Swiss-Prot record:
Pfam family, one: Ribosomal_S5
Domain S5 DRBM: 16-79
Complex formation: Part of the 30S ribosomal subunit. Contacts proteins S4 and S8.
Protein known as: Small ribosomal subunit protein uS5
Family named by the database record: Belongs to the universal ribosomal protein uS5 family.
UniProt comment concerning the protein's domains: The N-terminal domain interacts with the head of the 30S subunit; the C-terminal domain interacts with the body and contacts protein S4. The interaction surface between S4 and S5 is involved in control of translational fidelity.
Keywords: Ribonucleoprotein, Ribosomal protein, RNA-binding, rRNA-binding
Source organism phylogeny: Bacteria, Pseudomonadati, Pseudomonadota, Alphaproteobacteria, Rickettsiales
Function as written in the Swiss-Prot or TrEMBL entry: With S4 and S12 plays an important role in translational accuracy.
Cellular component aspect of the GO annotation: small ribosomal subunit
Amino acid sequence: MSVDRKPRTSNDAHDLSELLVSVRRVSKVVKGGRRFSFSVLVVVGDEKGRVGCGMGKHAEVAEAKIKAVNAAKKNMIRVYLRESRTLHHDVTAKFCASRVILRSAKVGTGIIAGGSVRAVFEVLGVQDVVAKIVGSSNAHTVIYAVFSAFKSMLSPKQVAGKRGKKVCDVINR
């Protein structure tokens, strides 16, 4: 009896793009010596406002990447974009020693972000954004800080409700 080891993909998984953020070789010291394995961090997105991150661990990089992609697909979140090109409002978030500042930008600015933050915005579908990493630039903590920022962002409807205005007044600023 053979077992199919291929990852299962759903119909919507075909239009997802994935980027490898980091690969780390970790070791566990056992009685016979060191046992090496790999830890992989991947971001996955549909380039239309949905993005997810996942981490996979395995003895081989390819298997770790498959695990990471599956984990990323499971925890995808929706990010509200203005005109499908930038963030609706500026946001700051912190995770461990990493702090990220994400700012919306004018048309033609591009993705001004360093390291692992750029990968998130590329798979998210953002064209104009400015991002700054303050503190630790460890890829894992920076990615989790960015996702914390995305989760704290408000939709235009929520912003309009807080301000007591119409959604069209909030969007057309």
